[in-house]
């Protein structure tokens, strides 16, 4: 089954609500949607970065250029089912650009799984779990509004784990914000925080113990992505788990973080690692090192979320579960059906490949003009 065509479409999907982070406020999310055609089938994937190039060195625009200029010409005509060879060719041809590679890699996995009439999770070994508890991000910036959202999510049995974005306000104001939320919902929900690199080590060393005392169970990326030494000291000095997100940007970074036990958990993201196989390698590094795997998101659409869910469902343990909330923070979905959240878990979709199909009308509607 030879690759006949690789199409890349830029889409911009509005957020259903502003998402306030330490470095930007996300009003919309842009994606490079990939469709690979072979043997009468189409495999789909996507590449993106939260808020554009402010979070990483890639964005939807660079992903499209890298694929169309370098990766697509290299892969067209090759055997679509030889996933290892295709990954090797991409690695040799392009340095970094992991989200571009992941978009291709996921589409190829989807294509092969569809050709075998298998779910993606079966293609890579089989799902251990059919649903994963899913956290919701509270990022309105308003304490009372965040409390109301948390109460609603618990009542509807959608989420009882909440990640709260910090770093825009002062640490003291952030702590008061956290304490008020935990006071209201802490007996019914777990609370973790994401600082998105906003603090230096001294600030983190003062305020992380106070967050732990307030009832926070997990602290994500408190310091700059490159400051592995600070992460190691903070992890050693605090009982609350420290989660690497921005710091986990390659297989090499995973090895270094694990070798020095800099953190307690890895935030897995297919787009950070270059696709399915490398994400599973990072999870294996984590497991061998006593580090927890956490199901991260790049605010993926239902396409990227389905792919990640299939991968995460094959992992034996995920103590802090996942945050695959992307499809529900967007104003609309790009697929014909929405993924399901039931009893606080996101459910693994059935059907071949990713288990979701692009809605052509919605794809056209959100395609960027020009």
Curated annotation (Swiss-Prot):
Residues reported in the UniProt entry to bind Mn(2+): 194, 220, 245
Enzyme Commission number(s) from the entry: 5.5.1.7
Cofactor: Mn(2+)
Residue positions of the active site: 165 (proton acceptor), 323 (proton donor)
Alphabetized InterPro entries for the sequence: Chloromuconate_cycloisomerase, Enolase-like_C_sf, Enolase-like_N, Enolase_C-like, Mandel_Rmase/mucon_lact_enz_CS, Mandelate_racemase_C, Mandelate_racemase_N_dom
Catalysed transformations (reactions): 2-[(2R)-2-chloro-2,5-dihydro-5-oxofuryl]acetate = 3-chloro-cis,cis-muconate + H(+)
SUPFAM superfamilies the UniProt entry points to: Enolase C-terminal domain-like (SSF51604), Enolase N-terminal domain-like (SSF54826)
Any single GO BP term: amino acid catabolic process
Entry keyword set: Aromatic hydrocarbons catabolism, Isomerase, Manganese, Metal-binding, Plasmid
SMART domains from the UniProt entry: MR_MLE (SM00922)
Pathway this chain belongs to: Aromatic compound metabolism; 3-chlorocatechol degradation
One GO molecular-function entry: muconate cycloisomerase activity
Family: Belongs to the mandelate racemase/muconate lactonizing enzyme family.
Function: Highly active toward chlorinated substrates but retains diminished activity toward the non-chlorinated substrates.
NCBIfam families: mucon_cyclo
Protein name listed in UniProt: Chloromuconate cycloisomerase
This protein's encoding gene: clcB
């Amino acid at each position: 089954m030879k690759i006949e065509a690789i199409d890349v479409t830029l889409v911009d999907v509005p957020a259903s609500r502003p998402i306030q982070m330490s470095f930007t406020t996300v009003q919309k999310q842009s994606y490079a949607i990939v469709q690979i055609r072979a043997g009468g089938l189409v495999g789909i994937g996507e590449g993106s970065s939260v808020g554009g190039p402010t979070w990483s060195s890639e964005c939807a625009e660079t992903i499209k250029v890298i694929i169309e200029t370098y990766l697509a010409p290299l892969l067209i005509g090759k055997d679509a089912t030889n996933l290892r060879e295709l990954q090797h060719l991409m690695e040799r041809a392009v340095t970094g650009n992991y989200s571009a590679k992941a978009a291709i890699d996921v589409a190829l996995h989807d294509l092969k799984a569809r050709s075998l009439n298998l779910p993606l999770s079966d293609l890579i070994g089989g799902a251990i779990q059919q649903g994963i508890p899913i956290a919701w991000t509270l990022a309105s910036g308003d304490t009372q509004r965040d409390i109301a959202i948390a109460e609603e999510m618990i009542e509807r049995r959608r989420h009882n784990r909440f990640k709260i974005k910090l770093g825009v306000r002062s640490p003291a104001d952030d702590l008061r914000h956290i304490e008020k939320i935990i006071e209201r919902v802490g007996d019914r929900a777990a609370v973790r925080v994401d600082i998105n690199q906003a603090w230096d080590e001294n600030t983190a060393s003062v305020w992380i113990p106070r967050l732990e005392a307030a009832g926070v169970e997990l602290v994500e990326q408190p310091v700059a992505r490159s400051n592995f030494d600070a992460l190691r000291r903070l992890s050693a000095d605090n009982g609350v788990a420290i989660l690497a997100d921005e710091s986990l940007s390659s297989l090499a970074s995973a090895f270094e973080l694990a070798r020095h036990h800099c953190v307690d958990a890895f935030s897995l993201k297919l787009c950070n690692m270059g696709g399915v196989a490398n994400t599973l390698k990072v999870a294996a590094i984590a497991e061998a090192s006593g580090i927890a795997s956490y199901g991260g998101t790049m605010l993926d659409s239902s396409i990227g979320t389905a792919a990640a869910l299939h991968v995460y469902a094959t992992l034996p343990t995920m103590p802090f579960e996942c945050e695959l909330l992307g499809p529900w923070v967007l104003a609309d979905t790009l697929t014909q059906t929405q993924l399901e959240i039931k009893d606080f878990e996101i459910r693994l979709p059935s059907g071949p490949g990713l288990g979701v199909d692009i809605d052509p009308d919605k794809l056209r509607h959100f395609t960027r003009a020009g």
